[in-house]
Amino acid sequence: MMSSCGPLLLAVSCCLVALTSSLNLDDPNVCSHWESYSVTVQETYAHPFDQIYYTSCTDILNWFKCTQHRVSYRTAYRRGEKTMHRRKSQCCPGFYESGDICVPHCAEKCVHGRCVAPNTCQCEPGWGGADCSSACDRDHWGPHCSSRCQCKNEALCNPITGACICAPGYHGWRCEDLCDHSTYGNNCQQKCLCQNNATCHHITGECVCSPGYTGAFCEDLCPPGKHGQQCEERCPCQNGGVCHHVTGECSCPAGWGMVCGQPCPTGRFGKNCSQECQCHNGGICSPSTGQCVCSSGYTGERCQDQCQVGTYGIGCSQACRCVNGAQCYHVSGACLCEQGYTGESCEERICPDGQYGLKCDRKCPCNTNNTRSCHPMSGECSCQSGWSGLYCNETCAPGFYGEACQEVCRCQNGADCHSVSGECICAPGYKGSDCAIACPPGTYGINCTSLCSCKNGAICSPIDGSCSCQAGWHGVDCSINCPSGTWGLGCNLSCVCGNGGACNALDGKCTCTPGWRGDRCDQHCQDGTYGLDCRERCDCSHADGCHPSTGHCRCLAGWTGIHCDSVCAEGRWGPNCSLSCNCKNSASCSPDEGACECAPGFRGTTCQHICSPGVFGHRCSQACPHCVHSNGPCHHVTGQCECLPGFKGALCNEVCPSGKFGKNCGGSCTCTNNGTCSPMDGSCQCYPGWIGSDCSQPCPPGQWGPNCIHTCNCHNGAFCSAYDGECKCTAGWTGLYCTQRCPLGFYGKDCVQACQCENGADCNHISGQCTCRTGFMGRHCETKCPAGSYGYGCRQVCDCLNNSTCDHMTGTCYCNPGWKGTRCDQAGGNIAESPNSLTSAALPMDSYQIGAITGIIILVLLVLILLLLFIIYRKKQKGKESSMPSVTYTPTMRANTDYAIAESLPQTEVLPNSNYFSNPSYHTLTQCSSPPHINNIPYGKMNNNQLFVNLKNTEPRKRLSLLDHTGTLPADWKQGGSFSELGAYGVDRRYMGKSLRDLVKSLPYHASSCSLNSSENPYATIKDPPLLLTKSTECGYVEMKSPAHRDSPYAEIHSSSPANKNVYEVEPTISSVQALTNNNCNGPFCQDPYDLPKNSHIPCHYDLLPTRDSSPSPTEDSK
């Protein structure tokens, strides 16, 4: 076949060379090169296949029969591509075809010249440049461009005279000088507008501001919170400190140090912490005011004074509880009792009640019912409140109360005083602790508990609540107006108003109806006036006065309108004012012709249009000015520029000043706490630690930073700084995020206080309180349990007898000599024991415990032996399963009418220990029927592309019902990448997250009911598998290998490889779906009269060989 194609290929090559050689080969600008092209040929090759035979062996499980393999070869055909070469002529680089010659090409057109070589122009006389387009370049001038220009700073040079044309910002003969500091621009003629010592750019006039200033002309100070060059530096001032706009130096409130971030150190206060505190006795000084916060027991401006008698504690705010003349300690409030008293507050008498004297042998002479106590030493009676006298048998005199009736009553306004408590019992109309306050307006009676019902300003009696009405009112609660025609107090006076005038119930003054006047409303309005009190003047032009009540003009004949000033009514014109005007936008209408006279800013026959953009005013005759920052042209009526928010000025070219924003800069910025205000909308850009529309709200708890976007990471109740997120720990915690307890031995705020616990006691890291170990007590656990007690908190009582001692921790009894036992309650005989020894009998180990432990050990050994036997059994069973056959379907490529060629799959998909079967003679045996449940497999794809299924136009529900099918391959089946996880035509091999291999493993397949007879080629027919869904009249082919499970030999489908593939010579077919979708077939599987001879149909069944155990031959592996 190869020899027959040689002359034909040579002839084709010669023709192609002749067609491509149209250029003149003698042209020196013609170049040639070789190009390659492909020709399809058909060639033969030796195709290996695996043949199976049986031998006798010692395999008991297979009845002493073993399967062996050998590799055989047969001749097969395949199509291939042969690469040919031919010479091709073309123009050399830089030339292009023009007829049969190659001419040079210039990328840029030669304006005044011609192209003589690639990208090379030959200019005409008098021109220069790469494209002959300019007389001289910018650096040369004069005849033949022979003189070099002397201009500097990008200045232009006159090509004729050589004079320099300076760029903006420069001047001088050669443009070597910059504009001075006050000018800029072309010829340095524009005046700089910079302020506050700013530098003006010599070209653009842009202002470079001095430190501390900003704005277009450096006219504004840096905004709050900024300072320095271009206001780019952020002020470090905290806690209300004010930053200098130039240096950034902080002016701090009193009590703050460097950058206002740290409070004054201990002992200092005031501005810049310059003053020294003067507090004594452990008082703490306020860092801002220097005011002393005194320690417990002291008071005064500098904490120099002890608490007054009767008070103690911090701020001397607590009252002493000491009684019976005891002295109170000003720091802790502890009581120092007088002789004869005891107790925490000295409230307990040493003598029993009713007794006194050094030996408590004398009886108190006091009245027991009225006496609080009897002095335990002197027997003096201390009377209860409300009683007095030597023996407490006299009541208090009027005006006195309390202990010994020494307190003076403070009751006023005739109130009674309670003899015991001194409480005032007020008379009706008064209240307060001393009855000095009269009942407030609206209340009356005892303790002012009753509410007055008086209305309309009536006065309520604080004693009985009776109402005194104001003028114009009457009734019990003064809620009724005076009857019509009456007025004054008690409604006793009569009104004198006429013509419907109203009478004021308070003063009787008349209020006249419109059109009347006078004290009694008995006079008409004068001519030319009308309305209430005749205060309004008639506004009539052509009228005979107006109505005295309404002011309506009485128009003369021939006039109309509200003021009688129009010939016709408003909006009408023509004969008898019978036509309506059609003018819009407040335009006036001519009464005789109806023509519209437009208002300023409008135009059109009916004034329906506003002025065109760019003009305004009367008849739209004025031109608008140039509005810089505006929504559009000027206002069509006024000609004013409508500035965008944030700008102002006649031309909208000025930014709103600091503190202003919005339309016409009419809004006032509300930003606080160093927030920056936008001149456009007034929105605030808040300083870190603040949020809100006006930056007035601090960050919510747990947030910090700009816009509070950061989340605090402080723990255990720590305070988080809203500015930088720094954690300030509560008592008992430390660390960057307050997650660490105080170190062992320390507690409290900042963990600076040392624990005082002893004897191994635990110290609370927050309060420092000691938790004692067993056997100890006391504030610092410094004391052992007292004799007779033991245990936690020393709350347990020892139970030892015979004067024995008890261990303060465990309560164990230490027996004295001669005693023994747990409680030392047994006589010890003659055995002398140490008084501190403690004996106990050892408990013998029971024999049943030893037996139980032995039985458990034996049981564990038996379980391990059974588990080992089970593992050995499973491994043996798996070894048997590896030799069972399975069936796999593989597509082939047609070569000719006698042979089929199996295409290769990627080597990575080869499975080890696979056994394959071939069908060299194709003996058809009895057809086998697959189990009925195989038809219900919900898949249309086989694993690893052993069988490709075309599902392109098949609905999912219909796929399950189709049984007969032929496999197809995509056109690019040779590309290994398409066989990874996709089936034919890109159909995914996975279904609901499972691969087909996993799904097939889980299906309950069973072995075929067919029997396989032992012969040289014992083939059996296998029915076409139900996974093929598209109907066809012809079939593919299959190849078989061993499965993974012995009990379902046809259940699992594995990948194949070129090394061990065995192909059945069955014709490839094209599915009905592929035929519809691929009319222009160019792939290796297209059918044509040459590929498919007559009578090439093969039935839809496949042959099966028995299994074998031999491995593939080395020849197959190398293949």
From Swiss-Prot:
Q: Does the keyword Membrane apply?
A: yes
Q: Which GO terms describe its cellular component?
A: plasma membrane
Give the Extracellular membrane side ranges: 23-851
- What are the disulfide bonds? C31-C92, C57-C66, C91-C102, C102-C115, C106-C121, C123-C132, C145-C157, C151-C164, C166-C175, C188-C200, C194-C207, C209-C218, C231-C243, C237-C250, C252-C260, C277-C285, C279-C292, C294-C303, C316-C328, C322-C335, C337-C346, C405-C417, C411-C424, C426-C435, C448-C460, C454-C467, C469-C478, C491-C503, C497-C510, C512-C521, C577-C589, C583-C596, C598-C607, C620-C634, C624-C641, C643-C652, C669-C677, C671-C684, C686-C695, C712-C720, C714-C727, C729-C738, C751-C763, C757-C770, C772-C781, C798-C806, C800-C813, C815-C824
Record-linked Pfam families: EGF_laminin, EGF_PEAR1L, hEGF
- Keyword check for Disulfide bond: yes
What are the entry keywords?
Cell adhesion, Cell membrane, Disulfide bond, EGF-like domain, Glycoprotein, Laminin EGF-like domain, Membrane, Myogenesis, Phagocytosis, Repeat, Signal, Transmembrane, Transmembrane helix
Q: Which residues lie on this side of the membrane: Cytoplasmic?
A: 873-1119
Q: Which GO terms describe its biological process?
A: apoptotic cell clearance; cell adhesion; muscle organ development; myofibril assembly; positive regulation of muscle tissue development
Signal peptide range equals: 1-22
Knockout or disruption consequences: Morpholino knockdown causes widespread disruption of myofibril organization and decreased muscle striation resulting in curled or bent tails, impaired swimming, and reduced motility in response to touch. Severely bent tails result from subtle abnormalities in somite boundaries and abundant gaps between myofibers.
TM region positions? 852-872
**Membrane topology per record:** Single-pass type I membrane protein
EMI domain location: 27-104
The lineage's top-level taxon is Eukaryota
Q: Where is the EGF-like domain?
A: 98-133, 141-176, 184-219, 227-261, 274-304, 312-347, 401-436, 444-479, 487-522, 573-608, 616-653, 666-696, 709-739, 747-782, 795-825
Its main localization is: membrane
Q: Where in the cell is it found?
A: Cell membrane
Q: Which residues are glycosylated?
A: N197, N272, N369, N393, N447, N492, N576, N674, N803
Record family assignment: Belongs to the MEGF family.
Record's function text: Membrane receptor involved in phagocytosis by macrophages and astrocytes of apoptotic cells. Essential factor in the regulation of muscle development including myogenesis. Likely plays a key role in muscle cell proliferation, adhesion and motility. May control the balance between skeletal muscle satellite cells proliferation and differentiation through regulation of the notch signaling pathway.
Protein name from the UniProt record: Multiple epidermal growth factor-like domains protein 10
User: Which species?
Assistant: Danio rerio (Zebrafish)
